Amino acid sequence: MSPPLQAKLDYVRSQLQEDVTQMLYYARLKSSTKDYQFKDINLNDCLGEVLEDYAPLLEEKQFVIINKLQSETVYTDRRGLQFMLGQIVSNAIKYSSDSPMLTISMIHSEIADVLSVEDNGIGVKKYDLPYIFQKGFTGDSTDSRKKATGIGLYLVKKMADDLNLRLEAASPWEKGFKIVIFFPKLKSNGGK
């Protein structure tokens, strides 16, 4: 099989997989029963699996990945976090620049561990930013957003809410997009 054909098939497979995953998580988030398994999750392992899933597209676009994570762990549901990270990586790919870059880092505060995922893509216009987590919102209808469904970041927000995580986004137009996930620090109950 020729490399261009293989790349096209990888793209189609990835799109189908993402669409099915979104549908399943949409149904899961609407369900009255949840099967989350909260435990300590190694962020590098979790992120590595997500990047592996998107490897063909990341390689095709020649993404530079800057992973500044150490051996970070967070307490959350692994599948939920992987879904969130997958949607964020997918958006970085869809709205990438000519020399795409994805930077992942973490800072620690007294109240939360803060994961930052930042790309250097087209970003979101300032007047659209307050609405990016709303269902169906696709923002400015430029050519790059014509295929947008407005469901990805909505589902990321819903999953974050279910997992008791806080999200923030920043995006100077045409200078990238940054999404920040706040993992609250659990208070010790003194062994009780």
Show which residues each predicted segment covers:
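Short conserved segments within the C-terminal catalytic ATPase subdomain
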Residues: 57-66
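Acidic ATP/Mg2+-coordinating residue in the GHKL
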Residues: 119
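Short helix-loop "hinge" at the ATP-lid/N-box region of the Bergerat-fold HATPase_c
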Residues: 92-93
